[in-house]
Regions:
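Noncatalytic, basic helical substrate-engagement surface that gates or grips nucleic-acid strands
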Residues: 2-133, 141-158
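Conserved small/polar residues in nucleotide/adenosyl-binding loops
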Residues: 161-167
Length: 171
């Protein structure tokens, strides 16, 4: 079995930075890149099943207070129009999440204390004999790449395998 493991928020939110333009264009591009990434994985990598991994609050914050603290500072510094864009993107993402949860046969994983990368790593551990394609721009996934695990960056359309490991700046 070959699983496509989607770092869903990463894929969706990174895609909006690919194009300049109005909010509708950015939202449309986020959908386009996310869905095209899935189509490419399905066809080129011959995936059998898609697993959407969704964000929860990280357990790491309970042990290391500064963990991702700069993200809140970044959000606090947004202009009103950027705040509106952020709000619309989260609303759109929630609608996408609802769609894949209720209208597809894809697996959807979410836990209140785990980030998507935790869920992806856990899924791979639970299915060691299967093949996995991680869809994400996150360079931290390089540590999971092996003969049975590869990574596809849906924004740059670059794939990494155990034979072509990414550098820290290339993902």
């Amino acid at each position: 079995m070959k699983y496509a493991l989607i770092d869903t928020a990463n894929t969706f939110f990174r895609a909006r930075h690919v194009v300049r333009g109005d909010l509708d264009t950015k939202v449309g591009m986020a959908f386009h890149i996310t869905l095209n990434s899935l189509k490419k994985i399905w066809h080129e990598f011959d995936a059998d099943h898609i697993v959407f991994c969704l964000e929860g609050r990280s357990w790491r914050k309970d042990f290391y207070e500064p963990y991702k603290r700069n993200r809140q500072e970044f959000r606090d510094a947004l202009t009103p129009s950027q705040q509106e864009e952020e709000k619309v993107f989260w609303e759109t993402f929630d609608a996408f999440k609802e769609f894949v949860t209720t209208k597809t046969n894809c697996t959807v994983l979410q836990h209140s204390q785990l980030e998507a990368d935790d869920l992806i790593a856990g899924w791979i551990q639970l299915h060691p004999e299967d093949e996995h394609v991680i869809v994400s721009t996150d360079g931290d996934f390089a540590q999971l790449i092996s003969p049975k695990v590869s990574q596809y960056n849906g924004v740059s359309t670059v794939s990494y395998t155990h034979l072509t490991l990414p550098t820290s700046r290339s993902v």
